[in-house]
Swiss-Prot record:
The lineage of its organism: Eukaryota, Metazoa, Chordata, Craniata, Vertebrata. Residues 127-169, 244-272 are annotated as: Disordered. It holds the Pfam family zf-H2C2_2. It is found in: Nucleus. The gene is ZSCAN21. Coiled coil: none annotated. This is Zinc finger and SCAN domain-containing protein 21. The keyword Cytoplasm does not apply. One of its GO terms (molecular function) is DNA-binding transcription factor activity, RNA polymerase II-specific. Residues 258-272 have a biased composition (Basic and acidic residues). The keyword Transcription regulation applies. It comes from Homo sapiens. Strong transcriptional activator. Plays an important role in spermatogenesis; essential for the progression of meiotic prophase I in spermatocytes. Belongs to the krueppel C2H2-type zinc-finger protein family.
Amino acid sequence: MMTKVLGMAPVLGPRPPQEQVGPLMVKVEEKEEKGKYLPSLEMFRQRFRQFGYHDTPGPREALSQLRVLCCEWLRPEIHTKEQILELLVLEQFLTILPQELQAWVQEHCPESAEEAVTLLEDLERELDEPGHQVSTPPNEQKPVWEKISSSGTAKESPSSMQPQPLETSHKYESWGPLYIQESGEEQEFAQDPRKVRDCRLSTQHEESADEQKGSEAEGLKGDIISVIIANKPEASLERQCVNLENEKGTKPPLQEAGSKKGRESVPTKPTPGERRYICAECGKAFSNSSNLTKHRRTHTGEKPYVCTKCGKAFSHSSNLTLHYRTHLVDRPYDCKCGKAFGQSSDLLKHQRMHTEEAPYQCKDCGKAFSGKGSLIRHYRIHTGEKPYQCNECGKSFSQHAGLSSHQRLHTGEKPYKCKECGKAFNHSSNFNKHHRIHTGEKPYWCHHCGKTFCSKSNLSKHQRVHTGEGEAP
């Protein structure tokens, strides 16, 4: 079996002894990009997978902590069973990928297994395009070594030690030379006569050599793919060079001052393939469909990721993750209704709901609102603007929340399920109203007498007592 000397670090990692038969074995050291932040979802997954029993004082605490870490990763309060299943399938799919592909796919942060497959298919098409070729220059041809004796006692002759040129496929012409930078401990077979006796060139049988050269070219193709991945701008591994020492341990060619070889480096990756995914709205192009899907949300205003705590919606899952942390931090500012806030300004905005303070007034009808966003949404009633349209039936809405609720009529989706009684709802506001039955929460209170209510409609009925419009319920 011929030894491959080109590729990424994972490809050139420790191998079985029978495969390490050449005098030119090299070890490539990965250069990790330090200080680069992992995606939030990946960070939570790693915390869950890497949690150790020794991190807790006892088994009960360990189990409790595992539950917390699992919920932070899978987020069952916002994900359906199908979405959680998809996360687990995606994790296992990335696990079974070759390490060089696994690192490349993870850099693109796919949100589903289907998206990961699309990325890999795009990469395959890119590799099949013309121009993705490589050749070894005539003056830099490397010998191909073959192990011909399992006992390690093969005879040697002067003629057998002459290097044979490595014939690469014409498919790889145009990239120029590829070098591998050696690091760590080298395996210097040439300096030990006993090791040299175990290896010699496969020139005894010309027909056998031709067949093996063909298989070496095929093997080189596989390793070239690894080099392509290593050279991608998005990959975490930096470019790597090859530096081969000669038998006497002289200075490597790449490190010779002023030498032509020393000035050569890994060639820049060829221009990537055409960006096939084009936005119909603005004409911007993308290399994969997932990025186009995310970009289109800037035009449609779609926000499919909804916080179950407050109902706020986001266009990207990463933004929802960042927002969700605001519900987990300390909230020193408490309202009489039981809600707490991390900032005093948020408490003041909330209290306007109780005091009915409304500093934002519509110039057309005089109606006032407690928040600026509410005024903007209300103003669309006068302008008739309905920027959110349903793709199924064409119906338009002035608010994204209205579109989201409407679309669930087509899908039948009811993502908000009560853990107490199992009842499901298609909108977070309906779920929150129902949940107060179980918790006894009464967030609406009368500023005249301090009485609290679980719904705003009940508060309105009660306030008629103070205004003289009717009896208290």
